C-alpha cells in the first residue's frame, strides 16, 4: 500500500495508524521509498508495554519498542505523530504548506508563555529558533525605536503594545530576512476570546495573516 500511494499522483501526503507489522524489513523499505517521494506521517500505537500487549492480542504482528520505532521512522525519512489528532494536524500541514527549504524558524505572537512553548516545540522537532538578526533589528528601530532593544525571537506579543509595530508587521519584517526559512504566527490568548469584540478582531487578524501568507514565498503556519 505504501508503494502504491507513493506512486499515486493524486496522493500528496501519506498518513498511517500502525500497531505492528508482520514484515519489518518490507515495511521499512516501502516506508523509505514512499518518504523519498512525498511526506509520510506515522502514528505508532502500542508504544508502552500495556499498549503493545493489547496490539499483539488482535494483530499478531511485531510491535517493537517506542525507541526502535522512532529510530526506524527517522532513518526512513518519515515523521512520527504521537496521537491521532497530531497525525491529522501534520497531514494537513504537510499538504497545505510548501517546503521551507530550511529549518530556521521565526515565531511571532502569543504571550510570553505561549511564545516560549512554541520555541520549545520548534527546537524539540528539529527547527532552529534563530535570534533576531541585525537587519531585522535595524528595521524595527526605524519603525519603533523603543522596541528594538527588547524584541527577540520568539516574539512576545505583549511587549508590542503601544510600540507602533504590530505582530503582523514584525512578522513581515522577519519573513523578508534571509535569516528565516519559515514562520509560526500565534493568534490570540485565552483572555482575547473573552472580549466583546473578539470575533471582529479575530477576523481582521486572520484576514491580515492570509494576505501575508499569500505574498510570502516562505511557509507560515498560523496557530489559533
PLM features: residue spans?
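Catalytic-core regions of core metabolic enzymes
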Residues: 1-224
